[in-house]
Swiss-Prot record:
Its cofactor is Mg(2+); Zn(2+). Belongs to the RNA polymerase beta' chain family. Mg(2+) binds at residues 473, 475, 477. It comes from Porphyromonas gingivalis (strain ATCC BAA-308 / W83). SMART domains: RPOLA_N (SM00663). Its EC number is 2.7.7.6. Zn(2+) 2 binds at residues 815, 889, 896, 899. The keyword Coiled coil does not apply. One of its GO terms (biological process) is DNA-templated transcription. This is DNA-directed RNA polymerase subunit beta'. Binds 1 Mg(2+) ion per subunit. InterPro entries: DNA-dir_RpoC_beta_prime, DNA-dir_RpoC_beta_prime_bact, RNA_pol_asu, RNA_pol_N, RNA_pol_Rpb1_1, RNA_pol_Rpb1_3, RNA_pol_Rpb1_3_sf, RNA_pol_Rpb1_4.
Length: 1433
C-alpha cells in the first residue's frame, strides 16, 4: 500500500507570480506520463490505461473505487491498488491532477516565436523568417563555427551546404565531430527547436545587455537604435525575473497534460462521444511523438525523421495556440479546434466567463409588476420563489422546532409546500433582505437590497420609485433576485444597499428616486392654482379649518385661499399668512416641518429640489417616509383628477396658416435674391433652412401659449408636458404644430445628413400626406437602427472605463499635496454653463479662501467647501478658487479623500475604501446609452438651431477689449475687426467685476470703442453668420496673383441667374497658390491675403477697395443636422486620446506669422518669437488658414482649421491644460444631451490616462530610453541612485568595476584602503538620475499597461499580456478589484479593506483584561512599562 503526495494551494495568498515553467517543475506537478493516445474504451466506457484519461495517473472515475474494483468504499482511502495502480480517493482529484508527455525532440513554444514582439528572435538577434526556417526544419543554424572557415555563429545553411561543410571539415580536421561539445574547435550546426535550445543555453544575458545599451546610447541611426531598444526590453525582462526564468525554457522538452475533467469526454446516445477539442489536439501530439520514437528506434532515414519532427512541432503549436497559425487544425465540420490559448481569450474564455462572471446559487428571476402600496425599502416576493430561496433556513427552523427529525423529510415538507412552512418562512425572512438586479446593470444602483414581503402570484413586485435607478418599466421587464447568506452579507445589504438608503445618484448627487409620470401629474394637478373657483379668496385660521371647508364642499381644491401656516425662517419656527390652496396644504401635511412651507406648483424639477433639501435637512429615514407619502398622494390625486386627454385637448393654433404663409413669402424672397445673384447657392440653402427653423420656433411658442391658457391652464396635454410627467415641447409641437424640417437619408460615405429644405407642414392631428409620411419613415427607422448599434458601443465604453479605473480606491485621508486646480465658472459666450458654486461644492480648498471685501476667512485650507460657503463665494467677487483634485493627488496607490472631496451618494466626505474609480466609470458609462438612444421618438427631426448674427449687451457696463485690431470704415460709424483672437468683456462700472465674456469673430462690425459705456440691449457687434470673410485692412487697388482660371479657380455660373463668380479650387498646379494683394498708387504691396479653397471672390482684379470692405466670402457649411454622432464617438475619441481625422496645425510658440514658399501643395508658415526663435509649419493648401501675415499668435493657437489634438496641447501647454481640455470637451458632449455628471468622475479617468511617463534620458538608472513607466517608479528609482557614485576607472580596486554604482560610504572605505596600500584609487562621477516626459494614453492602452497582469489579461489581448508577464516573472500584488475577484478573494475596498482584516472587536472589559495580561507577561522587573491608551470608542 503506497501513499501519494498531496499539494493543496492555500487560498490566503497575498500575491501571485507568473513565470515560465521549467521541465523540472512540469514533472514535479505531474502524476504520471501519458503514453497512449487512447481515451476510453467504447464498450466498457472505462478509461484506457496510460491513455489521456488514465485512472492511474489522474485518479479514479468513481469516488473511492479503483479501476479493477479490488478496493471499494471510503475505508480504503489513500491506498494505491496493487493490481491496477489506482489510488483510492475521491473523484474530484481528476479536476486537479496533471500528467505530462515526454517529447522525443525539443519543441519551441509558439507564443515565444509567433507573437510580436518575437521573444526568441529578439534574444538571439534573428529575424522571424529565419527563425521559422530553423524551427520548421528547413535550415541548419551554426551554433559554434569551430574550425570551419568563413562561417560565424547564427549563419543559416541549407542541407547541401551543411553536408558539404561536414565533408570538408572531415577532410581537413579529422575526428573533429568526435570532440566534446564544450571544445571550442568543434564545428556544431543543428536544425529545429533543438538548435534553438542550444543557442538559448549559450545566451549570456548580461553581456548582451551591456552591448545593446552601448549601441542604444551611441548609434547615430534612429532605426538601429530603436531595434536595439526593442531587443533590450526582452533581454531586460529576463534579467528582471532575477534568475527565475531561463531563456531555454521557451523551448519545451516536456508538455503538461491538463486534468481530464477540464477536457471532458461525454458519451452521447447512439454510441458516439462528445469531446473537448483539447483531447483531439493532445491525441495528435501523442500519436506523432510515439511514431517519432519508433522511427528513431528503427533508425529511419533522416528525411523521414525530419518530416516527423516538423509535424510534432506543428502538433504542439496547434495545441498551445491554434488561432495563430495560418493552417489551423480543423474539426470534421471545418471549424478550427479550440486550443489552450483560445480557452483563455475573449468573452467566452476562462477569465471573463468563469473567473469574473460566475453563475450563483440562491437566485431566481421573474417578471416585475408595480407594487404601489409597498414602502420604499420593500419588494413583493412570490411565495413559491421565497420558499425555494430560503429553503435551507426553513429546513433548519423545521428541525429546531422539532417538526421533523431529518433534513430529508424537511425537504419533502418544503417541496410539498405544506401550510406549516409559511409562518416559518415569514419568521425567517424578517431582517433578511434580498438583492434585486435588473440587467443591464449599468451602475451600482442596478442592484439594490429590499426587505421582501410574501405575495401571491408569480411576479415580483417593485416599488415604483426605484424604477428610475433600475431603468425598469413594467412592459415585461424581468429581474433577478439574489439572497445574501452570511451575516456580514446581510448586514451590508441592510446598511449599504437598502433601496431607501440609495436616494442620491452617485453621478451628480441629485435625488434619483423622484416621482415620475402619474405621481408627478397628480401632485402638479393639486398644487396648481385656479382663480375664480369656489371659495377663491377665503381666509382660514389654520390648515385644519381649510381641510374641513374642503371636505364640506365649501372650497375648491384649486382655489387660491389665505391660511395661517407654520413656516421655518433661518431655523426659527414662525406663523405667517400665505396665499395658497387646499391642494398645497395637503402636500404640506407630509413635508417635514423643518423644510418649511412648500408653496409652489410641483413639477418634476421642483420635486427633485424639495427631495434634495429634505435629505440635506432631515436625513435619509425621513426622506424615505416623505417619498412614500407623496407617492400615495400623487397616485390618488391623479386618479381623482381623471387626467386623461382626448382629441379635442390637442389644440391647433389658429395662427398656423398665417405663419406658414409668412414662411412661404420669405422663402420666395430668398429664391428671388438667389436668381438675381445676390447670394450664393449655399447661402440660399442656409437661409431657407433658417427661415423654416424660425417659423417652427414661433409656431411652438404660440402653441404653448395657447395650450397654457386653455381651460385656465388645466388642459391635460399641457399639464402632462408642463409637470414633466410625459412628453416634451418637441413632441407636442409635432402633435399640434408642424413636424418641421427632416434630415435627408445619408448616402453611405457622404457627409453628415443634409436637411431637406421643404419642411413637413402637417402635424399628427391633421395627418401627414403620403410624401410627408414617406419622408418621416426614414428618420423613424434610422432612430431604431442607431439605437441598436450604439447600445453595444456604450457598453464597450463602460467596460474600458471600468478596466482602466478599477484600482482607484480611496487609500488615505490626506496625501499632503500642495497642488490643485484653478476652477472658474464655465461660460459659453454669454450663458453660464456651470456656475462656480456647482464646480467647487463638496471639494476641498487648497488655500484659505478670504472674502475680498470683508477680509473674513470663508473656508480654511484643507477644509471641505460646504453649501453655505460655496454660496458666499458665488455671491462674492471671487472669480477663481483653487481646489484639490484627483488630477493633482500624490497618493502612491489610489487617491486620498481630501483630493476627491465629497461622496456624491451620501453628501458627506468620502470614506477610506470607497471605490471611486468604478463609480466614476459607471457614472460616465451609464448615460452613454442615453447619448446613443436620444435619436428616439422625434424621428430624425433636424434639431437645427437658428443661427444668430449679432451681439446685444445683456448688462449696463464698460467695454474692455483684449488683443483687438480694428480698422475704421470710411463714411461709416462702425469699425471692422481684423484680429482673430479678440475678447470682449463687459465690466461693472462700480466694482470692476466682469459681467460677460465674448469672443468677437473676425470681420465683424464693431459699434463701440474701448472704454465705452453700454446700456442693456445695445448692439455691440454684428457679423455674417453664413460666411467666413476676408476683409481689407487698407485702402488701395486689388491685384490677384496665382488666380488662374481652371488651375486655381473656376467660374461657376449660377443655374438660375446665369451670373458668374470665381470660386477658388484646390490648385492643380502645386507650385501656384492664389493670393489677393492690395497695392497703393506707387505699386507698393500693402497687404497680402491668401485665398483658401472654396472661397467665393467678390471683387475683380484692379478694383479699388475701401478699408473694411469684404474681398472674399467663404460659405460656412451650416445646416448639418445636429445628430448625435457627436455623442458617443466623440467621447470615445477623447478617452482613447485619438487624433481627430483632420487635426489643426498648432503654433508651439508665441510669435508673429510670416508666409513662406509653397512646397508640394503645402504652404510654409513661419512663426517668429520676439526673441528671434523661429518655427516652420507646412499647411496643405486645401485647409483654410485662420491667420494672416503679421498676425501675432500665442502658443497653442491653431493656424489652420480642424480640431486640436490632445497630444499637441500636452506638448505645448503642458499636462494641466490637456487634463482640463479632455474633462471639458467630454462634459460638453454630455451637457448637450442634458446629462449632468460631476467633474470629479472625469478627473478620475483622466488621472488614469496620465499615470505614465516616457523616459527621455535614462541616466544611470535601470530604465531604457523611450520606455513607458509609472511616474512613481521613476521617482523611486531616482531616489535610489540619489547621492550614489558611478565608477569611471576602477584603479587597482579588486572589488569595484567600471560602470558600477556604489554608495559614497563604500567608495570612501575602498579608497582609504587603497591609499593605505599606496595603490591607484577609484575614480568616480555622480550618478545621473533619469528624466522623463509626461505622456497621455488612451484608456485601452492604459488598461493594458496596469501593474497587474491579471487585470490586463482579463481585459484584452490575453495571450500577449500573459506571455510578456511570464518572461518578466511579474508579480501581481492583488491591489485592484479585478485581480482579487479572479483569485476569489474579497475586494480590497469598502468593507474588504485589508486594514480591517486584523481588527478584533471586543468588549471594553475584555480589552483591559487582555492588555493587563500582556503587560504582566512582557514586563521586565526593572523598567516600568509605558501606559497604553485604550481607544475611546
Amino acid at each position: 500500500m503506497a501513499f501519494r503526495k498531496e499539494n493543496k494551494i492555500k487560498n490566503n495568498f497575498s500575491k501571485i507570480r507568473i513565470t515560465l515553467a521549467s521541465p523540472e517543475e512540469i514533472l514535479e506537478n505531474s502524476f504520471g506520463e501519458v503514453l497512449k493516445p487512447e481515451t476510453i474504451n467504447y464498450r466498457t466506457y472505462k478509461p484506457e490505461r496510460d491513455g489521456l484519461f488514465c485512472e492511474r495517473i489522474f485518479g479514479p472515475v468513481k469516488d473511492f473505487e479503483c479501476h479493477c474494483g479490488k478496493y471499494k468504499r471510503i475505508r480504503y482511502r489513500g491506498i494505491v491498488c496493487d493490481r491496477c495502480g489506482v489510488e483510492v480517493t475521491e473523484k474530484k482529484v481528476r479536476r486537479e491532477r496533471m500528467g505530462h508527455i515526454h517529447l522525443v525532440v525539443p519543441v519551441a513554444h509558439i507564443w515565444y516565436f509567433r507573437s510580436l514582439p518575437n521573444k526568441i528572435g529578439y534574444l538571439l538577434g534573428l529575424p522571424t523568417k529565419k527563425l521559422d526556417a530553423i524551427i520548421y526544419y528547413e535550415r541548419y543554424v551554426v551554433i559554434q563555427p569551430g574550425v570551419a572557415e568563413g562561417l560565424s555563429q547564427l549563419d543559416l545553411l541549407s542541407e547541401e551546404e551543411y553536408l558539404d561543410k561536414l565533408d570538408e571539415i572531415e577532410r581537413t580536421h579529422k575526428g573533429n565531430q568526435n570532440l566534446e561539445d564544450t571544445n571550442p574547435d568543434k564545428f556544431i550546426a543543428k536544425i529545429g527547436a533543438e538548435a534553438i535550445y542550444d543557442l538559448l543555453c549559450r545566451v549570456d544575458l548580461d553581456s548582451i545587455s551591456y552591448e545593446l545599451r552601448d549601441r542604444a546610447n551611441t548609434d547615430g541611426s534612429q532605426q538601429r537604435k530603436t531595434e536595439a531598444l526593442k531587443r533590450l526590453q526582452v533581454v531586460e525582462s529576463f534579467r528582471a525575473s532575477k534568475g527565475v526564468n531561463r531563456p531555454e525554457w521557451m523551448v519545451m522538452k516536456v508538455i503538461p497534460v491538463i486534468p481530464p475533467d477540464l477536457r471532458p469526454l461525454v458519451p452521447l446516445d447512439g454510441g458516439r462521444f462528445a469531446t473537448s477539442d483539447l483531447n483531439d489536439l493532445y491525441r495528435r501530439v501523442i500519436i506523432r511523438n510515439n511514431r517519432l520514437k519508433r522511427l528513431i528506434e528503427i533508425k529511419a532515414p533522416e528525411v523521414i525523421l525530419r518530416n516527423e519532427k516538423r509535424m510534432l512541432q506543428e502538433a504542439v503549436d496547434s495545441l498551445f495556440d491554434n488561432s495563430r497559425k495560418s493552417s489551423a487544425v480543423k474539426s470534421d465540420n471545418n471549424r478550427p479546434l479550440k486550443s489552450l490559448s483560445d480557452s483563455l481569450k475573449g468573452k467566452q474564455g476562462r477569465f471573463r466567463q468563469n473567473l469574473l462572471g460566475k453563475r450563483v446559487d440562491y437566485s431566481a428571476r421573474s417578471v416585475i409588476v408595480v407594487g404601489p402600496e409597498l414602502k420604499m425599502h420593500e419588494c413583493g416576493l412570490p411565495k413559491d420563489m421565497a420558499a425555494e430561496l430560503y429553503k435551507p433556513f426553513i429546513i433548519r427552523k423545521l428541525i429546531e422546532r422539532g417538526i421533523v427529525k431529518t433534513v430529508k423529510s424537511a425537504k419533502k415538507i418544503v417541496d410539498r409546500k405544506e401550510p406549516v412552512i409559511w409562518d416559518i418562512l415569514e419568521y425567517v425572512m424578517k431582517g433578511h433582505p434580498v438583492l434585486l438586479n435588473r440587467a443591464p446593470t449599468l451602475h451600482r444602483l442596478g442592484i439594490q437590497a429590499f426587505q421582501p414581503k410574501l405575495i401571491e402570484g408569480k411576479a415580483i413586485q417593485l416599488h415604483p420609485l426605484s424604477c428610475t435607478a433600475f431603468n425598469a418599466d413594467f412592459d415585461g421587464d424581468q429581474m433577478a433576485v439574489h439572497l445574501p447568506l452570511s451575516n456580514e452579507a446581510i448586514l451590508e445589504a441592510q446598511l449599504l444597499m437598502l433601496a431607501s438608503h440609495n436616494i442620491l445618484n452617485p453621478a451628480n448627487g441629485a435625488p434619483i428616486t423622484v416621482p415620475s409620470q402619474d405621481m408627478v401629474l397628480g401632485l402638479y394637478y393639486i398644487t396648481k392654482l385656479r382663480p375664480n373657483t369656489k371659495g377663491h379668496g377665503l381666509i382660514f385660521y389654520g390648515p385644519e379649518e381649510a381641510t374641513i371647508a374642503y371636505n364640506e364642499g365649501k372650497v375648491d381644491i384649486h382655489a387660491p385661499i389665505k391660511v395661517y401656516v407654520e413656516d421655518y425662517e433661518n431655523g426659527e419656527l414662525v406663523r405667517r399668512m400665505v396665499e395658497t390652496s387646499v391642494g398645497r396644504l395637503m402636500v404640506n401635511e407630509y413635508v417635514p416641518k423643518k423644510v418649511g412651507y412648500v408653496n409652489e406648483v410641483l413639477g418634476k424639477k421642483a420635486l427633485r429640489d424639495i427631495i434634495g433639501s429634505v435629505i440635506k435637512i432631515c436625513g435619509v429615514a425621513t426622506t424615505a417616509k416623505f417619498l412614500d407619502d407623496i407617492k400615495n398622494l400623487g397616485y390618488y390625486m391623479a386618479f381623482k383628477g381623471g387626467l386623461s386627454f382626448n382629441l379635442a385637448d390637442v389644440l391647433i393654433p389658429d395662427e398656423k396658416d398665417q405663419l406658414i404663409q409668412e414662411g412661404y413669402t420669405a422663402v420666395e424672397q430668398i429664391m428671388q435674391d438667389y436668381s438675381m445673384g445676390f447670394i450664393t447657392f449655399n447661402e440660399r440653402y442656409n437661409q431657407i433652412i433658417d427661415t423654416w427653423t424660425h417659423i417652427n420656433g414661433r409656431l411652438s411658442n404660440v402653441l404653448i401659449k395657447q395650450l397654457s391658457s386653455d381651460n385656465d391652464g388645466f388642459n391635460s396635454v399641457f399639464m402632462m408636458m408642463d409637470s414633466g410627467a410625459r412628453g416634451s415641447k418637441e413632441q407636442i409641437r409635432q402633435l399640434s404644430g408642424m413636424r418641421g424640417l427632416m434630415a435627408k437619408p445619408q448616402k453611405s460615405g457622404a457627409e453628415g445628413g443634409q436637411i431637406i429644405e421643404n419642411p413637413i407642414l402637417s402635424n399628427f392631428k391633421e395627418g401627414l400626406s403620403v410624401l410627408e409620411y414617406f419622408i418621416s419613415t426614414h428618420g423613424a427607422r434610422k432612430g431604431l437602427a442607431d439605437t441598436a448599434l450604439k447600445t453595444a458601443d456604450a457598453g464597450y465604453l463602460t467596460r474600458r472605463l471600468v478596466d482602466v479605473s478599477h484600482d482607484v480606491i480611496i487609500t488615505e485621508e490626506d496625501c499632503g499635496t500642495l497642488r490643485g486646480l484653478l476652477t472658474t465658472e464655465l461660460k459659453q459666450n454669454e450663458d453660464v454653463v456651470a456656475s462656480l458654486y456647482e464646480r467647487i461644492l463638496g471639494r476641498v480648498s487648497v488655500h484659505d479662501i478670504i472674502h475680498p471685501t470683508t477680509g473674513d476667512i470663508i473656508v480654511r485650507a484643507g477644509e471641505e467647501i460646504r453649501e453655505q460657503a460655496a454660496q458666499i463665494i458665488e455671491d462674492s467677487p471671487i472669480e477663481a478658487v483653487e481646489i484639490r483634485s484627483v488630477l493633482t493627488c500624490e497618493s502612491k496607490k489610489g487617491v486620498c479623500a481630501k483630493c476627491y472631496g465629497r461622496n456624491l451618494a451620501t453628501n458627506r466626505m468620502v470614506q477610506r475604501g470607497e471605490v471611486v474609480g468604478v463609480i466614476a466609470a459607471q457614472s460616465i458609462g451609464e448615460p452613454g446609452t442615453q447619448l446613443t438612444l436620444r435619436t428616439f421618438h422625434v424621428g430624425g427631426i433636424a434639431s437645427n438651431v437658428a443661427t444668430e448674427n449679432s451681439l446685444l449687451s445683456k448688462y449696463d457696463g464698460i467695454l474692455e477689449f483684449e488683443e483687438l485690431r480694428a480698422v475704421d470704415v470710411t463714411d461709416e460709424s462702425h469699425q471692422v475687426v481684423v484680429s482673430r483672437m479678440t475678447e470682449l468683456r463687459i465690466a461693472d462700472p462700480n466694482t470692476g467685476i466682469i459681467l460677460a465674456n465674448h469672443n468677437i469673430p473676425y470681420g465683424a462690425k464693431l459699434f463701440f470703442r474701448q472704454g465705452d459705456a453700454v446700456k442693456k440691449g445695445d448692439k455691440i457687434i454684428e457679423w455674417d453668420p453664413f460666411n467666413a470673410v476676408i476683409v481689407s485692412e487698407v485702402a488701395g487697388t486689388l491685384s490677384f496673383e496665382g488666380v488662374v482660371e481652371n488651375v486655381t479657380f473656376k467660374m461657376e455660373s449660377d443655374e438660375t441667374t446665369g451670373l458668374k463668380e470665381k470660386i477658388i479650387i484646390e490648385s492643380k498646379d502645386k507650385t501656384m497658390a492664389p493670393y489677393a494683394r492690395i497695392i497703393d498708387e506707387n505699386g507698393e504691396m500693402l497687404k497680402n491675403y491668401s485665398l483658401p479653397m472654396g472661397a467665393h471672390v467678390v471683387k475683380d482684379d484692379g478694383d479699388t477697395v475701401k478699408v473694411g470692405e469684404i474681398l472674399v466670402k467663404i460659405p460656412r457649411s451650416v445646416g448639418k443636422a445636429g445628430d448625435i454622432t457627436g455623442g458617443l464617438p466623440r467621447v470615445t475619441e477623447l478617452f482613447e486620446a485619438r487624433n481627430p481625422s483632420n487635426p489643426a496645425i498648432v503654433s508651439e510658440i508665441d510669435g508673429e506669422i510670416g508666409f513662406g514658399k509653397l512646397k508640394r501643395g503645402n504652404r510654409e508658415i513661419t512663426v517668429t518669437s520676439k526673441l528671434g526663435e523661429e518655427k516652420k509649419y507646412l499647411i496643405p493648401l486645401s485647409k483654410q488658414l485662420l491667420v494672416q501675415e503679421n498676425d501675432f499668435v500665442r502658443a497653442g493657437t491653431p493656424l489652420s482649421d480642424g480640431a486640436i489634438t490632445p497630444a499637441d496641447i500636452l506638448a505645448i501647454k503642458g499636462p494641466t491644460a490637456v487634463q482640463e481640455y479632455i474633462v471639458n470637451e467630454v462634459q460638453d458632449v454630455y451637457r448637450l444631451q442634458g446629462v449632468k455628471i460631476n467633474d470629479k468622475h472625469f478627473e478620475v479617468i483622466v488621472r488614469q490616462m496620465m499615470r505614465k511617463v516616457e523616459i527621455v534620458d535614462p541616466g544611470d538608472t535601470l530604465f531604457l530610453e523611450q520606455q513607458v513607466v509609472d511616474k512613481f517608479e521613476v521617482m523611486e528609482e531616482n531616489d535610489r541612485i540619489w547621492g550614489k557614485k558611478v565608477v569611471i576607472d576602477a584603479g587597482d580596486s579588486q572589488v569595484l568595476k567600471a560602470g558600477q554604482i556604489v554608495t559614497a560610504r563604500k567608495l570612501r572605505d575602498e579608497n582609504s584602503m587603497l591609499k593605505r596600500k599606496d595603490l591607484k584609487i577609484v575614480k568616480v562621477r555622480d550618478a545621473k538620475s533619469a528624466t522623463a516626459s509626461q505622456i497621455l494614453q488612451g484608456i485601452t492602452r492604459a488598461a493594458l499597461q496596469t501593474k497587474s497582469f491579471m487585470s490586463a489579461a482579463s481585459f484584452q489581448e490575453t495571450t500577449k499580456v500573459l506571455n510578456e508577464a511570464a518572461i518578466c516573472g511579474k508579480t501581481d500584488y492583488l491591489e485592484g478589484l479585478k485581480e482579487n475577484v479572479i483569485c476569489g478573494h474579497l475586494i480590497p475596498a469598502g468593507t474588504g479593506l485589508r486594514d480591517y482584516e486584523k481588527l478584533v472587536v471586543m468588549h471594553r472589559d475584555d480589552y483591559e483584561k487582555a492588555t493587563a495580561e500582556r503587560k504582566s507577561f512582557l514586563s521586565v522587573p526593572t523598567a516600568e512599562p509605558a501606559m497604553e491608551e485604550a481607544p475611546s470608542e
